[in-house]
Amino acid sequence: MNYLTILLCNRKPTMLSRRNKEKSQHKEGVVGKYMKKDTPPDISVINVWSDQRAKKKSLQRCASTSPSCEFHPRSSSTSRNTYSCTDSQPDYYHARRAQSQMPLQQHSHSHPHSLPHPSHPHVRSHPPLPPHQFRASSNQLSQNSSNYVNFEQIERMRRQQSSPLLQTTSSPAPGAGGFQRSYSTTQRQHHPHLGGDSYDADQGLLSASYANMLQLPQRPHSPAHYAVPPQQQQHPQIHQQHASTPFGSTLRFDRAAMSIRERQPRYQPTSSPMQQQQQQQQQQQQQLQHTQLAAHLGGSYSSDSYPIYENPSRVISMRATQSQRSESPIYSNTTASSATLAVVPQHHHQGHLAVPSGSGGGSLSGSGRGGSSGSVRGASTSVQSLYVPPRTPPSAVAGAGGSANGSLQKVPSQQSLTEPEELPLPPGWATQYTLHGRKYYIDHNAHTTHWNHPLEREGLPVGWRRVVSKMHGTYYENQYTGQSQRQHPCLTSYYVYTTSAEPPKAIRPEASLYAPPTHTHNALVPANPYLLEEIPKWLAVYSEADSSKDHLLQFNMFSLPELEGFDSMLVRLFKQELGTIVGFYERYRRALILEKNRRAGQNQNQNQ
């Protein structure tokens, strides 16, 4: 027992507060941690993983005031280089860019073992490094695999270096032009023995790609055999200025040198004079086609400007293949409006428009050589027929074309448009045609559009039907009243008779097997189920009582259909009461009239 009490007394408490732990650590010292003796006393040891979140906001504040940020190496013992500010020194390192950094500063390589210099509120301007020193610094950077650089600070300083306000040492002369393209290259470290040649290879590829990109628009339009002579490669290239900054390399182009280079062709054609003449003739033919097409289209449709809602190549290819495919009756009017292209005589001439016969995409500006081609005038009229809705139905256009050429015929769906049996339009209605020639109806009264005629079967009132008889023709019959008429029921009230002075006579309906319903109100309005039920006595008492007693009733005990039934019963009671009141006054009025007539008769008898 004594042994257990001794153990419990000597045992230290397991739950210590954070403050007691810190005091014990200060008293006993740091145990189990190794610290180098050559670490300068002015640099504090900061745990990056614990202070990363706390220092992130301070880093953003420091990045917003980027002129006060500088690059300083910590020391030779610690191989981590950071961008420090005057007020604080953040240690926020970008994980993905830890091994992909720009070349170091010149003074950091000349003095690798120097202590950090005091920071200044302005950005230091460093002279550019020559290419051989830049490659050496990139080699040293690739061999050092433990460099950590703040990536956000690098991006902000890189934008400052690329801005025209801070470019003082490597900016071109004022007369050279204002075109400068600066970019920064970021090297990725791989193995130590591959770090030295990566920048040279990337720089060569980038310069070659920029040269090709600038030379692409200068290629001739027509294909020919080209050869690259060796003396052509010795011409002065685009004036490039390489300047290595503490954050990357900058490539700049001179406008004067670019203008000289652009005037020179990339390749010298080795074609004969005959081929050169043919090329010139082809270019003249293309220019002539453009001018003729613009003249025929009136300046509204050029070779490279079309409305957004239509594809010109699809339109032309559709017109070229109209005779090979079948159209639906809805869009059959399009065939008639575009069939004029097949009637125009075809020629192989340079001033005509090339229309491909296949299903591929065609163009309004063709080469003019070979293939089936129609006239530009025919194409312009077909394009205008698409975008301008015709004021007359397409059947009239088809009829005019058929009379002139003798090869066009009416489509059956178009014949129905001109038939005299078509129903007349009510007042306020009009017809119009779509871009494809389909007819639709406009209701100016309601500001709506409809595909169907307003007086068709869908527009019949309730109880009416359309009857087609061999004896009497087409007429409309009212199933409830037995009335029959030729005019549409909706058109009867405001129909204007233009064919004859008298309206048409009523037609006797034929005997049909259909029997009209006996109760007319059932077809129009559903019957109220509470019209014939007996009214409860308590509801009659409630109708005669004062409205101040309504709180005595518990309406929550009834369902919604029952309440609706009680409401209809109350309406019945109120109508009965109204009839009683009106009947009383009507009897009194009739009694007054009788008494008045009696006295008037007596006065007449006395006067006689």
Swiss-Prot record:
Tissue: Third instar larvae eye disk, expressed in a stripe in the morphogenetic furrow, decreases in the region of the second mitotic wave (SMW) and increases once again posterior to the SMW.
Post-translational modification: Phosphorylated by Hpo.
A Pfam family of this chain: WW
Cysteine disulfide links: none
Sequence motif Ferm-binding motif (FBM), location on chain: 32-38
Recorded coiled-coil stretches: 274-294
Biased composition (Polar residues): 64-89
Highest taxon above the source species: Eukaryota
Ranges of compositional bias, category Basic and acidic residues: 22-37
GO biological process assignments: apoptotic process; hippo signaling; imaginal disc development; Malpighian tubule development; negative regulation of cell population proliferation; negative regulation of multicellular organism growth; negative regulation of organ growth; positive regulation of apoptotic process
The keyword Coiled coil belongs to this UniProt entry's keyword annotation: yes
Biased amino acid composition, Basic residues: 108-125
Residues bearing PTM Phosphoserine: S413, S416
Regions of compositional bias (Gly residues) in chain numbering: 358-373
Residues covered by the WW domain: 423-456, 458-491
Extent of Low complexity compositional bias: 160-172, 229-242, 275-289
Phosphoprotein found in the keyword field: yes
Function according to Swiss-Prot or TrEMBL: Plays a key role in the Hippo/SWH (Sav/Wts/Hpo) signaling pathway, a signaling pathway that plays a pivotal role in organ size control and tumor suppression by restricting proliferation and promoting apoptosis. The core of this pathway is composed of a kinase cascade wherein Hippo (Hpo), in complex with its regulatory protein Salvador (Sav), phosphorylates and activates Warts (Wts) in complex with its regulatory protein Mats, which in turn phosphorylates and inactivates the Yorkie (Yki) oncoprotein.
Protein name: Scaffold protein salvador
Primary gene name: sav
